[in-house]
Every structure is written in structure tokens, then in C-alpha cells.
A protein has these predicted regions:
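Short, well-ordered beta-strand segments
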Residues: 53-55
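Catalytic core of pol beta-like nucleotidyltransferases
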Residues: 1-37, 42-48, 57-105
């Protein structure tokens, strides 16, 4: 699968419109981590105003987490994006979401 097909598959899997997906990719691209989506948008249970839950398996260094949240808030993305700090997640939570993770970047 080429890069364009991969992007289309991810875009469809997380149930957001094309413009929001491009904004999300651009914001996440500023950070050296792999990001995964999980939750209602991945499970096909999203409603019109559902947020997008994002998780990084890697611990985010320094102020990267807060800067990422600010970058998302300052962007033109039309949905709320909830970024989870992996260092604050319990092992039970990680186990609960691991089957649903869809790599975004």
C-alpha cells in the first residue's frame, strides 16, 4: 500500500473529514513520536461531536505534551482532540485500548 492509500485508510478509520485529517497530520508531524487513535472514532461509534482520542506509546519529553495540546487548540481543526499522556495511564488502560489503536503518525 502506498503512502496515499495508507493516509486514506487511516483517515477513514478515524472518521474525521479530510480537512481535519490534514490539519491533524501537520500538527502531529511537528513531534518525534508515533501517535495512535482509539475510542469511539476508531470503533465506528462516533457521533457528530465525538472527540478524537490520541495516545502516544512513548513518553513525551519536556513540554511536548502541553505544546501539542496548545498547537491543536490553536489550529483550525473542527473537532476536539484529547491527547493522553502515556506516563499517566495505568497498565489496565493500556490493555483496554491496545486492540483499538490505529496509527496516525
Amino acid at each position: 500500500m502506498d503512502n496515499m492509500d495508507t493516509n486514506k485508510a487511516i483517515h477513514k478509520a478515524i472518521e474525521i473529514d479530510t480537512e481535519d485529517y490534514e490539519i491533524l497530520k501537520n500538527v502531529l508531524g511537528k513531534y518525534p513520536y508515533k501517535f495512535y487513535a482509539y475510542g469511539s472514532r476508531v470503533k465506528g461509534k462516533a457521533r457528530r461531536y465525538s472527540d478524537l482520542d490520541i495516545y502516544s506509546v512513548e513518553k513525551m519529553e519536556g513540554n511536548d505534551l502541553i505544546n501539542l495540546k496548545w498547537d491543536l487548540e490553536d489550529s483550525d481543526i473542527t473537532i476536539k482532540v484529547d491527547v493522553i499522556d502515556p506516563s499517566r495511564c495505568s497498565e489496565e488502560f493500556r490493555e483496554l485500548i491496545k486492540e483499538d489503536l490505529v496509527e496516525i503518525k
